[in-house]
């Protein structure tokens, strides 16, 4: 039986681990990030992958830094024939990459060489792509640069969010891995080098990227809101306060007001001008210090007026 070590951390990784177990591989160990404090009470919380591994009685390693010798030697001591990674969250040293008989392969949530990096799902939506997918490739020390083994395309729907696409790609990754590993073991795959001229990056989202730029087109603002839903959530400012924008609809606006200006207030939302003739009707938001709510709830208590401007610094 093939001995596998799985390395992963978030919810995205769980179906991949589960599929390895269901397919009958001997998962001899799971490597995941350390428990972290979560929420206002800072409760120490295990990663979703650790929770799943413990359900199946699989030993769990949680190195703070996998590149340190005493940490990576614990992985090597498991003597895996194959290492599978999916959103592990640390750079893996060459000592691990070179050890397994069948190599170290990664389940990545984009059609490489596009969108290398830690936030490919967010960027696929923020860039308005109509499709993305899963790539399974060999791991190398350089970020997401290894030879491609298999790929599958996944459609991005008009109202797709990062949350819904995350779930679709997670399941697609598990399914593709199930087909890929037997072919890899049988030597039936021809690895394909990535075209370096087509490489793009999807680095982790920084706080300044979360703010809505109302001067962009309505389509770009709409994609921005979808791409940051449900985390970390796009935000703007209104009357000096930060407001998270959970959802908005594209609507036509024939208004020459400045981008960010409220030009119409309706029962279920308010329309904001962008950099072109497609405005955004905000229908779901979250004022600072409050819970997520519909715009109709918000409008019952808020003193909103036509001509007010969003996006001015608090």
Curated annotation (Swiss-Prot):
Q: Which GO terms describe its cellular component?
A: cytosol
* Catalysed reactions listed for this entry: L-methionyl-tRNA(fMet) + (6R)-10-formyltetrahydrofolate = N-formyl-L-methionyl-tRNA(fMet) + (6S)-5,6,7,8-tetrahydrofolate + H(+)
Q: Where does (6S)-5,6,7,8-tetrahydrofolate bind?
A: 110-113
Q: Which residues form a coiled coil?
A: none
Enzyme Commission code: 2.1.2.9
Under InterPro entries, the record lists:
Fmt (IPR005794), Formyl_trans_C (IPR005793), Formyl_trans_C_sf (IPR037022), Formyl_transf_N (IPR002376), Formyl_transf_N_sf (IPR036477), Formyl_transferase-like_C_sf (IPR011034), GART_AS (IPR001555), Met-tRNA-FMT_C (IPR044135)
Q: Name one GO molecular function term.
A: methionyl-tRNA formyltransferase activity
SUPFAM superfamilies, alphabetized: FMT C-terminal domain-like, Formyltransferase
**A Pfam family it matches:** Formyl_trans_C
Q: Which UniProt keywords apply?
A: Protein biosynthesis, Transferase
Domain of life of the source = Bacteria
What family does this belong to? Belongs to the Fmt family.
Q: What function does the entry list?
A: Attaches a formyl group to the free amino group of methionyl-tRNA(fMet). The formyl group appears to play a dual role in the initiator identity of N-formylmethionyl-tRNA by promoting its recognition by IF2 and preventing the misappropriation of this tRNA by the elongation apparatus.
Protein name, please?
Answer: Methionyl-tRNA formyltransferase
Name the species this protein comes from.
Bacillus cytotoxicus (strain DSM 22905 / CIP 110041 / 391-98 / NVH 391-98)
Query: What is this protein's gene name?
Result: fmt
